[in-house]
């Protein structure tokens, strides 16, 4: 997909930006694809860049993603927790699988979804092949990741591990309002003014 460009006029003349770079100037990051290593590296770099620009100002992360690689998603998750800036998360369209984990990983009180968004949580998917020993190793790793991710969902929602294990056994779909009641987000929003970046709290 070709990324559109926007023209900005200043006292120095006109300058063309690709749309994502222009949004980055306003501290907006867009995750609008499946999560893989390349996408994760870009998102991580954008988070680190915005922190270096102003560690006391918030970041808005918009999510419209079906999920993807667990390790790539966890790289983004860890960086969101690592940077000093509060990261607001906003679901537009869908946040499924690792996309849902990134949505709920936003700063407390700053996790949002637009009214017609869809959120889905489930256990990590994986396939094993090769020798029996290799299959056993891969199966144990999938179980470890499942336990770890369920623990993160417990941490951010306050539910018991028993409920999360039950709910993620199969695809668990929620509307924006369902996700709010579940604790994945804090508010269903329609107007942007609610989610403008705010200064980081004093350390």
Curated annotation (Swiss-Prot):
Catalyzed chemical reaction(s): Hydrolysis of proteins to small peptides in the presence of ATP and magnesium. alpha-casein is the usual test substrate. In the absence of ATP, only oligopeptides shorter than five residues are hydrolyzed (such as succinyl-Leu-Tyr-|-NHMec, and Leu-Tyr-Leu-|-Tyr-Trp, in which cleavage of the -Tyr-|-Leu- and -Tyr-|-Trp bonds also occurs)
GO molecular function: ATP-dependent peptidase activity; ATPase binding; serine-type endopeptidase activity
Gene3D superfamilies found in the cross-reference section: 2-enoyl-CoA Hydratase, Chain A, domain 1
Pfam families per record: CLP_protease
Main location: cytoplasm
Quaternary structure (record): Fourteen ClpP subunits assemble into 2 heptameric rings which stack back to back to give a disk-like structure with a central cavity, resembling the structure of eukaryotic proteasomes.
Protein name in UniProt: ATP-dependent Clp protease proteolytic subunit 2
Organism of this sequence: Myxococcus xanthus (strain DK1622)
Gene: clpP2
């Amino acid at each position: 997909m070709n990324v559109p460009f926007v023209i900005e006029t200043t006292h120095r003349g006109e300058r063309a930006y690709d749309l994502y770079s222009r949004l980055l100037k306003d501290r907006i990051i867009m995750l609008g694809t499946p999560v893989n290593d390349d996408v994760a590296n870009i998102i991580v770099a954008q988070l680190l860049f915005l922190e270096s620009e102003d560690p006391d100002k918030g970041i808005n992360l918009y999510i419209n993603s079906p999920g993807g690689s667990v390790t790539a998603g966890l790289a983004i998750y860890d960086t969101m927790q690592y940077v000093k800036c509060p990261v607001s998360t906003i679901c537009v369209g869908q946040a499924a699988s690792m996309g849902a984990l990134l949505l709920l990983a936003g700063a407390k009180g700053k996790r949002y979804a637009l009214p017609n968004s869809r959120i889905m949580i489930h256990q990590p998917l994986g396939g094993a092949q090769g020798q029996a020993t290799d299959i056993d190793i891969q199966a144990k790793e999938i179980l470890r990741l499942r336990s770890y991710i369920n623990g993160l969902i417990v941490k951010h929602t306050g539910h018991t591990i028993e409920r999360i294990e039950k709910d993620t056994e199969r695809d668990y779909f929620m509307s924006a309002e369902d996700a709010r009641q579940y604790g994945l987000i804090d508010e269903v929003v329609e107007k942007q003014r609610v989610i403008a970046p705010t200064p980081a709290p004093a350390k």
